[in-house]
């Protein structure tokens, strides 16, 4: 279900304050965050945000096409290692 249009998009307070501080100083540096649920807003465009995937922080460069999506969408948490082997030998 989508978020109500009456509400603003969710962005973690600590992340929003870091973005505003960097925009005010016109700096570009990597911002480390664990907040995968934060929505990407237009103020984040051009920044690199390192999003935690459960093991490490993956750097993600924010573009205009990403606005409106969540940060967690761009940091996959699962690694596919292939399907299980056919174990017909053990069944005999």
From Swiss-Prot:
Compartments reported by the entry: Plastid, Chloroplast
Record-level GO BP terms: ribosomal small subunit assembly; translation
A Pfam family of this chain: Ribosomal_S19
Record-level Gene Ontology MF annotations: rRNA binding; structural constituent of ribosome
GO annotation, cellular component aspect: chloroplast; mitochondrial small ribosomal subunit
PROSITE patterns linked to this entry: RIBOSOMAL_S19 (PS00323)
InterPro entries, alphabetized: Ribosomal_uS19, Ribosomal_uS19_bac-type, Ribosomal_uS19_CS, Ribosomal_uS19_SF
Transmembrane intervals: none
Key words, A-Z: Chloroplast, Plastid, Ribonucleoprotein, Ribosomal protein, RNA-binding, rRNA-binding
Protein's UniProt keywords contain Transport: no
Task of the protein: Protein S19 forms a complex with S13 that binds strongly to the 16S ribosomal RNA.
HAMAP family for this protein: Ribosomal_uS19
UniProt record similarity statement: Belongs to the universal ribosomal protein uS19 family.
Protein name stated in the entry: Small ribosomal subunit protein uS19c
